[in-house]
């Protein structure tokens, strides 16, 4: 089967990644030599890298600044084989920057400065659809109005839509989104959208029901980290448990890898259970490696883990 062409409309950031024993408390100054580095990131870009590594023909629509970070990101995407025909340059705003603070237990806190990401336009989106994609992959690190425009264009053309619902905003009019194939937030994003933190099966079901009332989706897939993933289709639910293959080093791109892998496998198999297992396996590998997009596994690596764990 030919590789599916997936259009990613999302963010492109340079990440300032800082490793530390713990983040400082209010009023506290810490000295920590855990290491600091600039690495490619952004949820849209991470997804584009993941989709490409997992076998998709990925076209990336995003905006970077006319600066050194933008130049480095462009070259990085080209080297990965991502189609950058719709990667635009903003000459008035810098490339987006994310400050990623990673604690020794693998957990992280992220602050994003949108920069050029906030200036992606409807015209940019319309041009990107000239690639005639098989699917649209959306994230919310760009203005919600632009994400909504992309979704409406896709819906008008009968193109399936996959939403990695991050980051979340309480005021996002989710009801205005057209029908999407999969809507996938993590636990904290689900809490922001619904007021319910899905930490167990009962609370996850209540949260999924609340989301289902707001979002027109074939499937709600809640990423639950160490608990795996919770899936609801409006009538039934199931849980795919997580896989632990080693110490969690960096969770930065785990959600991006999960949703990208879920999307690729769903488009290949049209089987939601197998697709979620594929996503869980991709996320399990990702957290054992440092970095954002650099930590994302290949299709072969994910399939090898699935065979080893007898998941499918």
Residue ranges and their predicted role:
Residues 28-31, 38, 53-134, 303-312:
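Conserved N-terminal subdomain of the carbohydrate kinase-like
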Residues 135-206, 227-228:
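Conserved beta-alpha-beta core of the PfkB/ribokinase-like small-molecule kinase fold
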Residues 7, 59, 137, 162-164, ...:
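Structural detector of well-ordered beta-strand residues that form the stable sheet scaffold
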Residues 125, 190-191, 229, 302:
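A generic structural signal for short hydrophobic patches within well-formed alpha-helices
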Residues 1-63, 68-72, 78-79, 247-248:
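Glycine-rich phosphate/adenosyl-contacting loop at the front of the ribokinase-like
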């Amino acid at each position: 089967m030919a590789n599916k062409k997936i259009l990613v409309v999302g963010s492109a950031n340079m990440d300032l990644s800082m490793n530390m024993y713990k983040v400082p408390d209010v009023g506290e100054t810490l000295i920590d030599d855990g290491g600091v580095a600039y690495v490619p990131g952004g949820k849209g870009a991470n997804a584009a890298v993941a989709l490409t590594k997992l076998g998709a023909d990925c076209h990336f629509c995003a905006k970077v600044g006319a600066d050194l970070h933008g130049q480095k990101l462009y070259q990085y995407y080209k080297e990965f084989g991502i189609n950058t025909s719709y990667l635009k340059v903003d000459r008035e705003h810098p490339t987006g920057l994310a400050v990623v603070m990673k604690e020794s237990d693998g957990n992280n806190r992220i602050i994003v400065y949108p920069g050029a990401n906030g200036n992606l336009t409807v015209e940019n989106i319309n041009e990107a659809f000239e690639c005639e994609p098989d699917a649209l992959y959306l994230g919310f690190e760009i203005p919600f109005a632009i994400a909504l425009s992309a979704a409406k264009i896709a819906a008008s053309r009968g193109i399936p839509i996959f939403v990695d619902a991050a980051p979340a905003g309480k005021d996002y009019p989710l009801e205005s989104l057209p029908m999407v194939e999969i809507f996938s937030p993590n636990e904290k994003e689900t809490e922001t959208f619904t007021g319910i933190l899905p930490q167990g099966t009962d609370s996850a079901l209540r949260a999924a029901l609340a989301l289902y009332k707001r979002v027109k989706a074939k499937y709600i897939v809640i990423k639950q980290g160490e608990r795996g993933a919770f899936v609801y289709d409006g009538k039934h639910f199931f849980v795919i448990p997580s896989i632990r293959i080693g110490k969690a080093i960096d969770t930065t791109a785990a959600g991006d890898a999960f949703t990208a892998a879920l999307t690729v496998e769903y488009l290949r198999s049209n089987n939601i259970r197998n697709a979620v297992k594929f996503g869980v396996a991709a996320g399990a590998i990702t957290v054992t490696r440092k970095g954002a997009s650099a930590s994302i596994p290949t299709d072969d690596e994910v399939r090898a883990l699935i065979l080893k764990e007898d998941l499918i």
